[in-house]
Amino acid sequence: MSGKTLTRMDLSEAVFREVGLSRNESSELVERVLQLMSDALVDGEQVKVSSFGTFSVRSKTARVGRNPKTGEEVPISPRRVLTFRPSHLMKDRVAAGNRS
């Protein structure tokens, strides 16, 4: 593992190099795509990127949890959580990278 993190700037730079848009246009394109994805998730829609995976929002009901330090029961409120399910192609690709 390299420990490197792919950032918005890295994505913009890749669009700039690969597509040929200006740096400004590349940055705006990346921001717009991320905004569309975020908006869809906030609205409860799934975001499916072929050969990559599916982002979705799951609703979790209220439940009783436990404080691990004290053992005391604490209520956990209902909430929405973001989930990502990688595609089989992505899983295979990551697994193949583990072998090298």
From Swiss-Prot:
The answer to whether keyword Transcription regulation applies is yes
Superkingdom: Bacteria
Question: InterPro entries from the xrefs?
Answer: Hist_DNA-bd (IPR000119), Histone-like_DNA-bd_CS (IPR020816), IHF-like_DNA-bd_dom_sf (IPR010992), IHF_alpha (IPR005684)
Which terms does the UniProt entry file under GO BP? Answer: DNA recombination; positive regulation of metabolic process; regulation of DNA-templated transcription; regulation of translation
Q: Name one GO cellular component term.
A: cytosol
Q: Pfam families annotated for this entry?
A: Bac_DNA_binding
Per the record, the similarity remark reads: Belongs to the bacterial histone-like protein family.
Q: What does this protein do?
A: This protein is one of the two subunits of integration host factor, a specific DNA-binding protein that functions in genetic recombination as well as in transcriptional and translational control.
Subunit-level organization: Heterodimer of an alpha and a beta chain.
This protein is called Integration host factor subunit alpha
